[in-house]
Amino acid sequence: YCGQLRNKVVLQRKFPKQGNPYWDYPTVASVCQSDRFNCTCQNHSRPMRSCNNLLLHEIQNYGNLGEPATRNRPLYNGSPNYPLGNCAEQHAANDVLNALDKKNCPKSLNDLYFSRARYVRDSRELDACVNCRTILPNAQ
């Protein structure tokens, strides 16, 4: 998936009049899968515009969407407090939950499994942030 994102940016730089205007690489990409219902989605980090109700309810236990966590957040030494809903894992989980809604499947955050997050620019692996590990039980 990181390779697809890099190729998309290269094409947009070559042909700036087609499609979206020039943009830089997203920071992080992740893949989410629901084995129980055979659904896989991939996404990258950016601000979240709309959120599945199940994920939104869980996010709101820790603060408001788009703002750093303010409530019930476990403290890890030196870990940054990213805005809730900006992470690639949360976007991928949102896509899977929306796909399961369309199939009328029962949903649970415990049924979602995640790949290791990767930096898009060079595909280095990255540990999930504190917010993702708190909100999404199986985030790595």
Model-derived features: positions:
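Active-site or metal-binding loop neighborhoods of secreted/extracellular toxin and effector enzymes
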Residues: 77-78, 98-140
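Glycine-rich short-loop/terminal segments
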Residues: 1-81, 101-108
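Processing junctions and N-termini across compartments
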Residues: 26, 45, 86, 123-126
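Extended aliphatic helical segments
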Residues: 9-10, 28-31, 96, 120, ...
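Acidic helix/loop or adjacent segment enriched in Glu/Asp that either coordinates divalent metal
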Residues: 77-98
